[in-house]
């Protein structure tokens, strides 16, 4: 049941130890090494007020074939700018 798994995932992330484990799982990764190994088409999206926006240009320079689509919505682009987010994904997927 997808809804149950989603709820349990969110509850675990909110839990004190779960939150630390989640952040460790993310931030302990060697993102640069993993990113450099990627060979698939890449769509890079971020809003100017997103915490990751300052890294958008660097990510594009590391993967010159990537497609960059700025959107709006701070750290919640799919929620706050769903039309631009969906349009960028549709364009990227050619649908």
Model-derived regions: residue spans:
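Conserved alpha/beta-hydrolase catalytic His-Asp/Glu region
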Residues: 1-35
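A structural signal for well-ordered alpha-helical scaffolds and beta->alpha junctions
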Residues: 16-19, 52, 82
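A short acidic, amphipathic alpha-helical/loop segment
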Residues: 34, 55-58, 84
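Conserved loop-alpha-helix segment in the C-terminal half of the alpha/beta-hydrolase fold
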Residues: 41-79
């Amino acid at each position: 049941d997808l809804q149950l798994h989603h709820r349990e995932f969110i509850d675990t992330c909110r839990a004190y130890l779960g939150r630390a484990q989640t952040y460790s799982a993310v931030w302990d990764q060697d993102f640069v090494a993993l990113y450099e190994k990627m060979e698939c088409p890449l769509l890079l999206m971020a809003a100017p007020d997103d915490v990751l926006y300052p890294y958008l240009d660097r990510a594009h320079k590391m993967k010159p074939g990537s497609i960059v689509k700025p959107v709006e919505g701070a750290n919640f682009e799919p929620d706050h700018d769903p039309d631009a987010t969906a349009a960028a994904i549709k364009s990227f997927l050619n649908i």
